Amino acid sequence: MKIIKITPRGFCKGVVDAYATCKKIAKLYPNHEKYLIGWLVHNKEIIKELEELGIQTKDDKNHSRSEIIDSIEIKDKNNPPIVIFSAHGTDQKTIDKAREKGLVVFDTTCIYVTKTHDLIKEKIEQGYQIFYIGVNNHPETISTLSIDKSIILIETVNDIENIRTESEKPIFVTNQTTISIYEFEEITETLKSKYKNIEFKNDICNAAKDRQDAVINMPSEVDLLLVVGDIKSNNSKKLVEIGIKKQIESHLIWNTKNIKDEWFINKKCLAITSGCSTPTWLANYVIIFLEKKLGTAND
């Protein structure tokens, strides 16, 4: 079987920067309790590595980040706990609460997420109604919706028919940085047919877009796609969805243990890629495993 290693793959710059910040914090503050508020990025291997550095992840779907901050005790005022907010973004009130409480705060929010937030705030000040295309309950979406209660979330095209908004307000549409280009195009085309006074800004980040484009433009000979990424990783799951949309059998794998032999039956060309939050070493480990398993090594 031929193997094609799709590039780019692996960590994006935002993840590299966030991870480097955590490693620096671990080195500079050895005597402080250190907590990640939410997964730094959606990958279990990274969370394990950070735990080994003394950084504990606090993430609970039943409690908000604000409530998590409330639960952190300051036992030594000379060495207060350090809290690190994830790359997906966190609402400003929660960050302010952490500082007011006396915690040492580090915010690793991705620059692309910050740019989207700044643009939304600017458009709200200009009198626009904001439509936000994103995944409900994803931390990036939660942080964005916290900017203003008037922001309307659109998860699928089916949500559009239920939208109720002030007709005289101009509409500005932007999106979560890790949705697929297909989702953005499908939803925006439907919105164009319903609203006249509407503007769009595609805020899919460059790293996610580059990885999506690479899958979209895979050689036609590919008949099996494997994406190395965590089950919680939205950008990794979108790569799988794009493969399926191209009518290629596609699977998300987070280690070598969930690779199934039946996937390779009657297949001739395997393409491998990974999400923005997948460590390069993990993607390479899976590639080497598959090369040995399939008895081949190709570019």
Curated annotation (Swiss-Prot):
EC numbers on record: 1.17.7.4
Sequence positions that bind dimethylallyl diphosphate: 42, 88, 138, 233, 235, 277
Chain sites annotated for binding [4Fe-4S] cluster: 12, 110, 205
Annotated isopentenyl diphosphate binding sites: 42, 88, 138, 233, 235, 277
UniProt GO BP: dimethylallyl diphosphate biosynthetic process; isopentenyl diphosphate biosynthetic process, methylerythritol 4-phosphate pathway; terpenoid biosynthetic process
Entry keyword Magnesium: no
Listed pathway(s): Isoprenoid biosynthesis; dimethylallyl diphosphate biosynthesis; dimethylallyl diphosphate from (2E)-4-hydroxy-3-methylbutenyl diphosphate: step 1/1; Isoprenoid biosynthesis; isopentenyl diphosphate biosynthesis via DXP pathway; isopentenyl diphosphate from 1-deoxy-D-xylulose 5-phosphate: step 6/6
Cofactor(s) in the UniProt record: [4Fe-4S] cluster
One GO molecular-function entry: 4-hydroxy-3-methylbut-2-enyl diphosphate reductase activity
PANTHER family: 4-HYDROXY-3-METHYLBUT-2-ENYL DIPHOSPHATE REDUCTASE
HAMAP family, alphabetized: IspH
Family from the record: Belongs to the IspH family.
Role description: Catalyzes the conversion of 1-hydroxy-2-methyl-2-(E)-butenyl 4-diphosphate (HMBPP) into a mixture of isopentenyl diphosphate (IPP) and dimethylallyl diphosphate (DMAPP). Acts in the terminal step of the DOXP/MEP pathway for isoprenoid precursor biosynthesis.
Protein name, per record: 4-hydroxy-3-methylbut-2-enyl diphosphate reductase
Organism: Malacoplasma penetrans (strain HF-2) (Mycoplasma penetrans)
Gene: ispH
